[in-house]
A protein has these predicted regions:
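Short alpha-helix boundary/capping segments
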Residues: 120, 173, 200-211
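Beta-lactam-recognizing serine transpeptidase/beta-lactamase-like catalytic domain environment
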Residues: 1-197, 243-254
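Short, gly/Ser/Thr-rich active-site loops of penicillin-recognizing serine hydrolases
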Residues: 112-116, 129, 206, 210-254
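Noncatalytic linker/hinge segments flanking ATPase motor cores
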Residues: 17, 23, 170, 197, ...
């Protein structure tokens, strides 16, 4: 299976194998480099840093070596990994823009915006963004039902277990956390949205995906309306009409 199809089909087994080959410390290097496990610096109090586990972390906290089997869970974002929606939105924006990490703010525009860069190859960015585009826009993609007309929405769903399958069966519950993160357009993205729906029985694409889709659609609807209004205001004044304009629809004249 190719990387593209693994992203489009959301194939956990593919990424189990990738995680096994990389090892936990390399996963932690890329995860931390893209902002996981650290505060984003958004203008909100008590921001949680989340957790990107590593061998030094487990030795410091639990005083034992890292178990290789845990790498498999971390490779698909489970196990000890914890993230916030704003971290995922920031990470997705960084990947889509070639590695530029933006500090988020609660305002329309920041002329002095601070950024940092994490090195990502052009080939890596292209392959990942093509995969994320396929998730929404290729038949068989796990979020094909979220595609939008004339908008290149790219995205990825995620479904996080809240407990083991055995515990869930004992308690008679299958509730999960449903995630979706999306950006648009595919080239030079200008909006990124991350959503989580907690304690749901639906997967991320069904639970959180429509939230992201609707926000992106509303953004473009408002943007297009503003552009249309600007074009109308800037249009030259029309010359006065000197004779009446007559339109006939379905009328027979004698």
């Amino acid at each position: 299976m190719s990387l593209h199809n693994a992203i489009v089909d959301s194939c956990d087994v593919f990424f189990y194998n990738v995680g096994k080959q990389l090892g936990i410390d390399k996963i932690a290097y890329y995860g931390s480099g893209l902002g996981l496990g650290k505060r984003t610096g958004i203008d909100l109090p008590s921001e949680e840093p989340g957790l990107m586990p590593s061998e030094p972390w487990v030795e410091r906290v639990f005083h034992h070596k890292w178990y290789a089997g845990e790498t498999i869970s971390v490779a698909i974002g489970q196990g000890a990994v914890t993230v916030t929606p704003i971290q995922l939105a920031r990470m997705a924006a960084a990947v889509a823009s070639g590695g530029t990490l933006v500090r988020p703010h609660l305002l329309k525009n920041d002329p002095n915006m601070k950024t940092e860069n994490f090195p990502l190859s052009d080939n890596t960015v292209e392959q990942v963004t093509q995969g994320l585009y396929g998730v929404v826009n290729e038949g068989g993609g796990t979020a094909y039902h979220l595609r939008l007309q004339n908008i290149d929405l790219c995205g990825k769903s995620g479904t996080a277990q809240l407990m083991s399958y055995d515990a869930a069966n004992r308690m008679g519950t299958k509730k999960m956390d449903g995630w979706f993160v999306g950006f648009a357009p595919r080239r030079n993205p200008e909006i990124v949205v991350a959503a989580i729906v907690q304690d749901t029985v639906e997967h991320g694409g069904e639970a959180a995906g429509p939230v992201v889709r609707d926000i992106v659609k509303t953004y473009y609807d408002k943007k297009n309306a503003r552009m249309q209004q600007t074009a109308t205001n800037d249009a030259p004044a029309q010359p006065p009409i000197t004779k009446p304009l007559v339109a006939t629809v379905g009328v027979q004249h004698p």
